[in-house]
């Protein structure tokens, strides 16, 4: 007697296709997903059809959201939604709509609500987080931009840490980097989408930067914060990515002073420009290149962890017993494991990292 509702990005993009799947009771898109309970009630009363998607251009409001769960030490706070970029491989603008943001005042109110739940760390999230400040029906950003937002958040005493989830390299300017380096609350951890180490491929992807800018961003971060953690997104197997172009990506990533990679195989998406690009890369080659970069990521992470051995760092311990161990993260996103002690749950402790165990965790 279960009721199956499909909501979110996929439902917005492929509502008709999903509705034909046996057992699906309801499909609702981006604008209507926040009325899920209301739609379920109407379905039971036979008042509406099972499909309700919309023209994504009509999604013209910001819906606040943050995560709070049992035994959580971190909360994820959405400050921005949608994207105005037109990357040739991406369906996010079609699924999530235009870039739009919450107000700084409301964000601060939500941070205080989160703090009352005992949360120690807030992760600032968005579809294009660095574009914060964009308002509907406006051709320019609000005077309250991302830099001003993090300045305001840094003054909140009830939260110990703020972490930026991901930020585009062209939006990660020197002012933001320098501010984080001096911040009381924002931790030295950046996750920056690269997607390719080949300028030719970046241009085909219609990204808003080339490798020189990306290298500059990484070097600037390390100049101000030598112990910072830098994660990078990369896509392999994009149409036209020859062996030479992939080698350029590998070599570029090899010399970058970064800490880990998130590697994605390119996958075709309907209604994207890249879907019609020639020189499609076979799936086996995509998989091979993905594995190569995942191995590089393991080496990068191990090297970064080793560079922190002997240093005293602040560890936020998670509130969960994992087979006799407790895990946590340092401010610069090193995963630490220690023997279970309930008194450590949801506490921040300054400890010296002593070694790396066989599972890849740092020990204290």
Language-model features: locations:
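Contiguous mid-protein beta-loop-alpha structural module that forms a pocket-lining wall or clamp
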Residues: 241, 256-258
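Residue-level signal for inorganic ion chemistry
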Residues: 9, 36, 124, 164, ...
């Amino acid at each position: 007697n279960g009721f199956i509702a499909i909501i979110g990005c996929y439902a917005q993009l492929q509502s008709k296709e999903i509705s034909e799947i046996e057992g699906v009771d309801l499909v609702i898109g981006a604008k209507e997903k926040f009325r899920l309970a209301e739609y379920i009630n109407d379905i039971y009363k036979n008042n509406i059809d099972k499909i309700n998607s919309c023209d994504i251009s009509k999604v013209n409001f910001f819906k606040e959201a943050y995560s709070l769960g049992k035994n959580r030490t971190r909360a994820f706070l959405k400050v921005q939604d949608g994207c105005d970029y037109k990357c040739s491989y991406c369906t996010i603008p079609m699924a999530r709509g235009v870039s739009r943001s919450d107000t700084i005042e409301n964000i601060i109110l939500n941070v205080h609500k989160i703090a009352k739940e005992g949360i120690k760390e807030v992760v600032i999230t968005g579809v294009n987080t660095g574009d914060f400040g964009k308002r509907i029906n406006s051709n320019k950003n609000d005077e309250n931009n991302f830099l001003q937002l993090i300045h305001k958040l840094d003054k909140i005493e009830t939260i110990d840490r703020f972490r930026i989830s991901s930020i585009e390299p062209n939006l990660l300017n020197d002012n933001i980097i320098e501010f984080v380096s001096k911040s009381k609350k924002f931790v030295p951890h950046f996750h920056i989408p690269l997607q390719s180490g080949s300028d030719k491929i970046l241009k085909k992807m219609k990204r808003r930067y080339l490798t020189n800018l990306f290298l500059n961003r990484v070097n600037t971060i390390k100049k101000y914060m030598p112990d910072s953690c830098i994660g990078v997104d990369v896509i392999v197997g994009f149409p036209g990515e020859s062996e030479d172009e992939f080698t350029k990506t590998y070599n570029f990533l090899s010399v970058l002073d970064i800490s880990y990679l998130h590697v994605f195989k390119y996958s075709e998406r309907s209604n994207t420009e890249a879907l019609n690009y020639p020189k499609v890369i076979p799936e086996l080659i995509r998989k091979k290149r993905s594995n190569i970069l995942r191995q590089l990521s393991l080496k990068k992470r191990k090297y970064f962890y080793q560079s922190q051995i002997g240093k005293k760092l602040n560890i936020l311990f998670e509130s969960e017993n994992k087979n006799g161990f407790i895990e946590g993260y340092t401010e610069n996103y090193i995963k630490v494991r220690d023997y279970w002690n309930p008194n450590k749950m949801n506490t921040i402790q300054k400890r010296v990292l002593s070694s790396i165990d066989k599972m890849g965790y740092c020990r204290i």
